[in-house]
Amino acid sequence: MKPKIGFNTDVFVEDSGRTVTRMNILYSDLIIQHGGIPVIFPPGVLPQEVASGLDGFFLIGGDDYKSSLPASGEIPDRYLEVHPRREETDLNWASWLIKSDLPVLGVCGGLQALCLAAGGTIYGDIESEVKDPIQHRRMGKGDLPSHIVQWQGFQEGGLPPGSFEVNSSHHQSVATLPTDWRILASTSDGIIEACCDPAERIIGIQWHPELNREEPLGHFILNRFIEQVRSRLELDSA
């Protein structure tokens, strides 16, 4: 039996004024190639109504959540607000997933949604809030490495600690982790590039394995997520 993995989607207002929901096909291709079935949810769907048929969930990247803005309300120059319907849906899903037993992988904005929902905080703009930051916004193609991260590793083992190039591109990031969460990878300026909950069931990364199929760290994490999903499915089927 193939595992069913849920996805959130983006909301975009076209030049014509028409509002559409969409998702980069590379996300679903990634899951199909790993033997899964993508189940794609538009904004407004309540997780408690549909999640019983899922074996895992993948929170995709996107623009900036209004919830990430500082208490002062100051809006960074690089701020690109995600559509309000998407923000509401993403944070509903993230809150529900944190309380569930589903394996979860969040990429870029998906990582930030999980941290916000679990009680963490976000830098609204790295360049204006972090001292001496490195370049986190990629200037070239999306599949190209942008900087190096220091990987700390999972408690259970697997890929050992080391340095890896990743195709990260973002101007926001996790500032403080939710209680008991821990850093999996970070950059030389201290920015968190990957983290997990205490059980290592919920994983978030800032970079994009869907854009680069050759990048080893992202695909180690993706393969581990798929293994967790399959293990859960086998237990449910036993």
Which role fits each region the language model picked out?
Residues 111-113, 132, 173:
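Short, catalytically relevant binding-site loops at active-site mouths
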Residues 169-176:
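The feature captures the conserved acid-bearing segment of alpha/beta-hydrolase catalytic domains
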Residues 107-111, 118:
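Active-site loop->helix "elbow" adjoining a glycine-rich segment at hydrolase catalytic centers
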Residues 181-189:
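Short, Gly/Ser/Thr-enriched beta-strand-loop segments that form substrate-interacting elements
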Residues 1-105, 116, 123, 127-157, ...:
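N-terminal beta1-alpha1 cap of cysteine-dependent amidohydrolase-like domains
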Residues 108, 170, 208:
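Active-site glycine-centered loops adjacent to acidic/histidine catalytic or metal-binding residues
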